From Swiss-Prot:
It is found in: Mitochondrion. It comes from Neurospora crassa (strain ATCC 24698 / 74-OR23-1A / CBS 708.71 / DSM 1257 / FGSC 987). PANTHER family: MITOCHONDRIAL 28S RIBOSOMAL PROTEIN S6, SMALL RIBOSOMAL SUBUNIT PROTEIN BS6M. Keywords: Mitochondrion, Ribonucleoprotein, Ribosomal protein. This is Small ribosomal subunit protein bS6m. The gene is mrp17. The keyword Transmembrane does not apply.
Length: 117
């Protein structure tokens, strides 16, 4: 199955974001999954303040990861992200059913940065 995870990590240290993505990536690869794309969207204001782990956040560092994995692997990635105190919020979406004609509709992750506007 093709999945997409959008994660928001507490801002300030890019090494934390890299470590978190590396952990999730290793988990996917070790269980036979394939990582299709990873994008670093950078730090942005959150739509509203979010409180997690007794901290209030107004900004977050966004990243997107698109990958093929089994349902069990996807659930483990979700649990790992949810348990990590560096993560403010994640959103997970199932994009495809694993068939080639379905997967071919999804290209690169679209993003228009502020510099391009």
């Amino acid at each position: 199955m093709l999945y997409e995870t959008i994660g928001i990590v507490r801002p300030g240290n890019i090494a934390e974001v890299k470590e978190l993505v590396l952990t999730a990536g290793k988990l996917i690869l070790n269980q036979g999954g394939v990582i299709r794309d990873i994008k670093n969207w950078g730090t942005f204001l959150l739509p509203r303040p979010i409180s997690t782990n007794q901290q209030r956040h107004n900004r977050g560092h966004y990243f997107v990861m698109r990958y093929d994995a089994s349902i069990a692997t996807h659930e483990e990635v979700r649990r790992t992200m949810k348990a990590d105190p560096r993560v403010i919020r994640t959103a997970n979406v199932k994009l495809g059913d694993g068939k080639l004609e379905t997967l071919s509709r999804f290209g690169a992750i679209p993003w228009r940065s502020l510099e391009e506007a």
